Amino acid sequence: MAARQQQKGTGFGVQYEDFVPKSEWKDQPEATILNIDLTGFAKEQMKVTYVHSSKMIRVTGERPLANRKWNRFNEVFTVPQNCLVDKIHGSFKKNVLTITMPKETITKVAYLPETSRTEAAALEKAAKLEEKRLLEESRRKEKEEEEAKQMKKQLLEEKEALIRKLQEEAKAKEEAEMRKLQEEAKANEEAAAKKLQEEIEAKEKLEERKLEERRLEERKLEDMKLAEEAKLKKIQERKSVDESGEKEKILKPEVVYTKSGHVATPKPESGSGLKSGFGGVGEVVKSAEEKLGNLVEKEKKMGKGIMEKIRRKEITSEEKKLMMNVGVAALVIFALGAYVSYTFCSSSSSSSSSSPSSSSSSTKPE
């Protein structure tokens, strides 16, 4: 029987070459012998199986070739009816697999008539035809199984590809959503940071404006204090000048003309009255000075406390109004004191100037 080869491939890149090995039947009186030529195969690369349901012997084997190719075979042989199944045995020598199938009854071919031999040959031919039919049917089934297997494998690969595609799409969608969320979070964070920075800058500007206003208020209060001190100093200087003038008027002696032409000092009575008048004015001025000094001292203490509060940023609107009222009151008191002093001094000077003129007219020499 001539060998035939057929190439088959799989999805894994391995190619199989199928072939039909040469086989030969030998009928002997004691047993039926089947010889199969398996050149190139080793004993470990083949397998012999007896199928009880169909009373057939299946011989399979495969061996690797070069370039990811394999050589394989799958043959089925019908076991003769006059055979002891449990005594079938085989051997592999010189690349030939020999399967021996002992007979139940030993026949002697030499004594068989010619008709028996013809019947035996016909039976053998029929057995070979049956064997060929079974072999073709077995190959057809194997082919169908292989096609079904390939179809199943293809469907599985398509299913895996679809699952992989869906997973990739889901992963890409998830990454896009995650990226979008990260961008939104970053934008919100930047907006919050910007808003916080703007609030800090606005707060700093407000603090600077408040500090500038406090500085202006301190400067105004300082200028007001300096102006009040200058006015006080001016009034005190004017008062001291007026007092020195009055003292000169008081200490100036009066010239009295007598009959003898001598100059005499003023009378003690008139001097004592004038002195007492100026003493009253001095007391008024002194009282005004004491009140003014107390008011100035109080103002200085209050000014120090206010300045301390301004430095500590604790001054209130009521304290500001109080400072303004104190300044105005001080100015009024200073003006009143100056006016009183000036009035008394003027009256004293007019009275003293009128006294010498009257005395001189009365004491004019005859």
From Swiss-Prot:
Species for this entry: Arabidopsis thaliana (Mouse-ear cress)
Compartments in which it is found: Cell membrane
A- repeats: 129-133, 135-139, 156-160, 206-210, 211-215, 216-220
Function comment: Seems to not be involved in heat resistance. Unable to mediate restriction of long-distance movement of the pathogenic tobacco etch virus (TEV) without causing a hypersensitive response or inducing systemic acquired resistance.
Domain of life: Eukaryota
InterPro entries named in the record: A-crystallin/Hsp20_dom, HSP20-like_chaperone
Homology family: Belongs to the small heat shock protein (HSP20) family.
UniProt domain sHSP: residue ranges: 14-121
UniProt GO BP: defense response
Stretches for region 3 X 14 AA repeats B of [IMA]-[RK]-K-L-Q-E-E-A-K-A-K-E-[EK]-[LA]: 163-206
Protein name in the entry: Inactive protein RESTRICTED TEV MOVEMENT 2
Transmembrane segments: 322-342
Record's bilayer topology term: Single-pass membrane protein
Region of interest (6 X 5 AA repeats A of L-E-E-[SKR]-[ERK]), ranges: 129-220
Biased composition (Low complexity): 346-366
Pfam families: HSP20
B- repeat locations: 163-176, 178-191, 193-205
Residues covered by region (Disordered): 345-366
Record keywords, A-Z: Cell membrane, Membrane, Plant defense, Repeat, Transmembrane, Transmembrane helix
Protein's UniProt keywords contain Membrane: yes
GO cellular component terms, semicolon-separated: plasma membrane
